Amino acid sequence: MFNASDRVQVLSEALPYIQSFAGRTVVVKYGGAAMKDSTLKATVIRDVVFMACVGLRPVLVHGGGPEINLWLEKLGIEPQFMKGLRVTDAPTMDVVEMVLVGRVNKELVSLINQAGGSAVGVCGKDGKLLTARPQGESGIGFVGEVASVNPQLIHNLLDGGHIPIVSSVATDEEGQVYNINADTVAGELAAALDAEKLILLTDTPGILQDYKDATSLIHKLDIRQARELIAAEVVAGGMIPKVTCCIRSLAQGIQAAHIIDGRAPHALLLEIFTDSGIGTMITA
């Protein structure tokens, strides 16, 4: 248990990071175990509110896979995945939109407001924030990718002292609704906002050299090394869209992308405000 001296030391270590990142935008992709465990959820909410209180400009992009699967099961629809992406036919798309926009997003808004923040929930449709296009791969249905980002709505919310909570549902130019991978949305939004950092909360310690060995964490790598890991299939499955979105956002100018373990309490604060950090950092 921390004593008073330990707490002072922690705050002292955090001070230069607070000073350095004041006024900077940090995009956080929130998903996985940190959404399912109520204790972890509470720490993430507190971390985001803390970030806002000390002068950072957090933007939270959320998934909702477990909640979507729960409602698909209730409605007798079998969840299917292909290459880490949810196969989304028309009935599944209806459930995805209902769950992400109507349930998960508004719950997060409520929790952040209760914790002392001022959250506003939006999806890609709002303010023409995101325009979607088909992902293009056969057999995955209404799975989209980001065609364009109009970040003005998010800028307005941040300038007004709010914490934007973004769900990854958007429409194309004709109004067709698409489910976009939340990691992808977080990466494209981070680039459009010229964010200081992109942070992805996952269910692993980060990028592992051997996915069976939690101690084989790769602490730091650059874009070239990340691409080599994908080609060598060290990065596979659901980690592919995570690493790919980091690469894309770095190529568009953000300073650093982090893949961290959302199962660790206060993982966000450990990454941003400590010397050692946590997880894997990817740089240009």
UniProtKB/Swiss-Prot annotation:
Pathway: Amino-acid biosynthesis; L-arginine biosynthesis; N(2)-acetyl-L-ornithine from L-glutamate: step 2/4. The lineage of its organism: Bacteria, Bacillati, Cyanobacteriota, Cyanophyceae, Acaryochloridales. The gene is argB. The record marks K29, K242 as: Transition state stabilizer. It catalyses: N-acetyl-L-glutamate + ATP = N-acetyl-L-glutamyl 5-phosphate + ADP. The keyword ATP-binding applies. Belongs to the acetylglutamate kinase family. ArgB subfamily. Catalyzes the ATP-dependent phosphorylation of N-acetyl-L-glutamate. One of its GO terms (cellular component) is cytoplasm. One of its GO terms (biological process) is L-arginine biosynthetic process. It comes from Acaryochloris marina (strain MBIC 11017). Keywords: Amino-acid biosynthesis, Arginine biosynthesis, ATP-binding, Cytoplasm, Kinase, Nucleotide-binding, Transferase. Substrate binds at G64, G65, R86, N179. Its EC number is 2.7.2.8. InterPro entries: AceGlu_kinase-like_sf (IPR036393), AcgluKinase_fam (IPR004662), ArgB (IPR037528), Asp/Glu/Uridylate_kinase (IPR001048), Glu/AcGlu_kinase (IPR001057), NAGK-C (IPR041727). Transmembrane segments: none annotated. Pfam families: AA_kinase. It is found in: Cytoplasm. One of its GO terms (molecular function) is acetylglutamate kinase activity. This is Acetylglutamate kinase.
